[in-house]
Amino acid sequence: MQTETVGGAVFEQWEPAEVRAAFDRHEVVIIDVRTPQEYAFEHIEGALLAPMAMFKPQNLPSQEGKPIVFHCGSGVRSRRVAEACMEAGFTRIAHMTGGFTAWKEAKLPYVGINPATGAPRVVEPTT
């Protein structure tokens, strides 16, 4: 994890494997800021959806005890959302470097769509 201080706030950039490990230990909340369509097609199991287009920092859940890690497709939108949170007064915020693309490149599991049925299914990439 890389950390920098921005205007008095701590901004963290997490690698996908770090996010997965912390999420498995119930230490973080993952928020996906992609569109509902992107989320429906594939997403990290357990991630909450808060699309950037409708995002308001004041609507975030409490960070007491669990930091929020934002992610998007590439890391661009999640960084913008994290910056908006810092501007709104959050003192610690994080995003996942490389976004969902990096998550898949790291061969981490996710929920995708079964092309035969259209039903969601957990995808366990192989190395």
Model-derived regions, located:
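Rhodanese-like catalytic fold shared by cysteine-dependent sulfurtransferases
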Residues: 1-29, 36-67, 76-127
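Short, surface-exposed ligand- or partner-binding patches at beta-edge/loop junctions that are enriched
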Residues: 71
